[in-house]
UniProtKB/Swiss-Prot annotation:
Name under which the protein is recorded: NAD(P)H-quinone oxidoreductase chain 4, chloroplastic
Entry GO CC: chloroplast thylakoid membrane
Similarity comment text for this entry: Belongs to the complex I subunit 4 family.
Annotated keywords: Chloroplast, Membrane, NAD, NADP, Plastid, Plastoquinone, Quinone, Thylakoid, Translocase, Transmembrane, Transmembrane helix
UniProt subcellular location: Plastid, Chloroplast thylakoid membrane
GO MF annotations in UniProt: NADH dehydrogenase (ubiquinone) activity; ubiquinone binding
The protein's Enzyme Commission number: 7.1.1.-
The reaction(s) this protein catalyses: a plastoquinone + NADH + (n+1) H(+)(in) = a plastoquinol + NAD(+) + n H(+)(out); a plastoquinone + NADPH + (n+1) H(+)(in) = a plastoquinol + NADP(+) + n H(+)(out)
PANTHER family cross-referenced by the UniProt entry: NAD(P)H-QUINONE OXIDOREDUCTASE CHAIN 4, CHLOROPLASTIC, NADH-UBIQUINONE OXIDOREDUCTASE CHAIN 4
Organism phylogeny: Eukaryota, Viridiplantae, Streptophyta, Embryophyta, Tracheophyta
InterPro entries linked: NADH_Q_OxRdtase_chain4 (IPR022997), NADH_Q_OxRdtase_chainM/4 (IPR010227), NADH_UbQ_OxRdtase (IPR003918), ND/Mrp_TM (IPR001750)
Amino acid sequence: MSDFYWLTIIVVLPISAGSLIALLPHRGNKVVRWYTICICLFELLLTTYVFCYHFKLDDPLIQLEEDFNWINLFDFHWRLGIDGLSIGPILLTGFITTLATSAAWPVTRNSRLFHFLMLAMYSGQIGSFSSRDLLLFFIMWELELIPVYLLLSMWGGKKRLYSATKFILYTAGGSIFLLMGVLGMGLYGSNEPTLNFETLANQSYPVALEIIFYFGFLIAYAVKSPIIPLHTWLPDTHGEAHYSTCMLLAGILLKMGAYGLVRVNMELLPHAHSIFSPWLMIVGTIQIIYAALTSPGQRNLKKRIAYSSVSHMGFIIIGISSITDAGLNGAILQIISHGFIGAALFFLAGTSYDRIRLRYLNEMGGIAILMPRIFTMFSSFSMASLALPGMSGFVAEFVIFLGIITSPKYLVMSKILITFVMAIGMILTPIYSLSMSRQMFYGYRLFNVPKSHFVDSGPREIFIFMCILLPIIGIGIYPDFVLSLSVDKVETILSNYFHG
């Protein structure tokens, strides 16, 4: 038990502070915006302080643990704790949410509700990453869906209600399987039901039952990640949502699925994971190729970026299913890396839409001369997306490759085949990424429009751009900055596979 309730404060602060937005004076939207940004900044600084001064990097066990008995009837605890696996996603959540609130500056309609929902989503995400009780994890997982649904249905494009309904149907459908898995694991085996992660990690199940539990969790995480064929909500949702919501979806929401896959499926159900991992490897490989081939056919700019997200998530799935130190560390690095890159691409797609009011790539062209700063930013992040050496995506994909090649679980022939198919996927990525830049920025299509309409990016947008670009280059040059957080925890997780 920690001496002070740091994690409870970090989880509860955003939603509590967000509920006070209703009490702010009605003096336009500026007060609400600054209040929300200050709360996000304070939360990020508090989280960073706690991790710098109260977290020991060389200890793979759970730290800063908090445990309050919440409901006596069935041993339900408010149980929080962090380790090397959850630090990266929590800091990423704070960083991207802070930037997304400053990206939401142009939102004027119902801005109080909009900013409250962003803060509520922040609490749900941090709660999911830091919960050490399976039912609390489920509650936080669900808490985060309600703000997303409202953000999608109230702010966005013409088809926003359709895409929001599709999102909630998919994710709520997946959550049913998650709840069944949570209750099944909690009620199995012991006289008293227990939902504590530590107790469940030492619990053994009959193989058939473990496979059923694993499959239930896998469906929930496959919807969220997304893993094909449960990915079809993602392009629609991204195509219609406001770009600050897209930043949160691409930067954090998709990473919750991958985090759950490691935290629950790998840690608590190791035997089932070693049975399922070859199939996950195949699905991940197909996903990279499928998304890379589907992306060039998308006319909508944001849908094309969404398919690139699906392709990048394929690398994470392959890293998780390689069951090696390098593979899993690479997957965690890719989670952080794509969190930055995905958020940045959606932010730039949104800012360019604000200026030219065009969604479809075949209507665009010639923006580079009119808006050189946006062109420079977009080109930089396109390079990061296609894993240019010196940027975080390259290191993550390289480490995942290393994980597959060194994996003792797979035969040499299957490793060569998977690596070959992944390499094809990496060759296809520049094709859709660079063709997107070409269609947007080159040509003469927009030259006959009066140029007075177009304003290049201002200081706020350049600041957000630099805030995302610096970590991408920093991690690309010195990946140990992220890997040092997770390396001990990864060894602990994998010890179940080789000694269990």
